[in-house]
Amino acid sequence: MTDGIVALGGGHGLYATLSAARRLTPYVTAVVTVADDGGSSGRLRSELDVVPPGDLRMALAALASDSPHGRLWATILQHRFGGSGALAGHPIGNLMLAGLSEVLADPVAALDELGRILGVKGRVLPMCPVALQIEADVSGLEADPRMFRLIRGQVAIATTPGKVRRVRLLPTDPPATRQAVDAIMAADLVVLGPGSWFTSVIPHVLVPGLAAALRATSARRALVLNLVAEPGETAGFSVERHLHVLAQHAPGFTVHDIIIDAERVPSEREREQLRRTATMLQAEVHFADVARPGTPLHDPGKLAAVLDGVCARDVGASEPPVAATQEIPIDGGRPRGDDAWR
């Protein structure tokens, strides 16, 4: 068991990690991507200029207290209005977060207040205090296969029929949320992934403050790989390709452990190749049964057991962290096309 876990991601992948982490400790901090531009989140960020609330709402629901009060409020948070009027498609939680953010003039204060109502013992934090956009270089959309097309927006990137080659954040070098940096520095375990690789996982290492904190923290760092490649973003990607893409976007980024579902890499030959590839992240690879049978989803209980084992085998024995080379700038699972998360 570990005392403090920080999970970075968004959408269904982050929900799975949080559901696993809370089995190990009540003190879980979610650091959530803030680039969603679809569904209810997209409408609210456009109309009210707020941080998109959908993934933040889902993280709060994942960490809500198991008490009757907490479960009731988690259900309320997730309730989505029907009909065809102005509120159609909006979850109550999205509207509450948008309203609290306006009243309190601070998205972190809004999340803390709603977390208090739900009985969350940890925290849910945006990775940046402002809404971001994701921009991608995509190939395969032009007659000349060597040509890239610039695609902007999380939904457009997640659903492109082309091949995503590289992503970047707008604005460039955005500030990290101060409380997220503090949580990473104080954690015992930091978990990145699973999730949409280009729009939920990689954005965290593109925020200078978060990247610096991940290098500087003494926490054990684990990377959880997806169970399957996603249509659109990573269609046709091998497990090895996921690692190469992460390393390409974050030179010098390292983790201690990479967790891969055993069924995804059945042959010893492939596993040995992955172990060699993982050395570029200075990581040890763990092949384990972490899938929910018959689904492309992680099983929270199985994932919790693997994370617990990773911590138990090396508590206090990890390599000293690489010191950050710059001041840390702060404050200034489902496919992302699924509106159920927004």
Curated annotation (Swiss-Prot):
Record-listed Phosphothreonine modification sites: T325
Record localization: Cytoplasm
Record Gene3D superfamilies: CofD-like domains
Mutation effect (T325 to A/S): Lack of phosphorylation
Compositional bias segments (type: Basic and acidic residues): 333-342
Family: Belongs to the gluconeogenesis factor family.
Protein name (Swiss-Prot/TrEMBL): Putative gluconeogenesis factor
Originating species: Mycobacterium tuberculosis (strain ATCC 25618 / H37Rv)
Classification lineage: Bacteria, Bacillati, Actinomycetota, Actinomycetes, Mycobacteriales
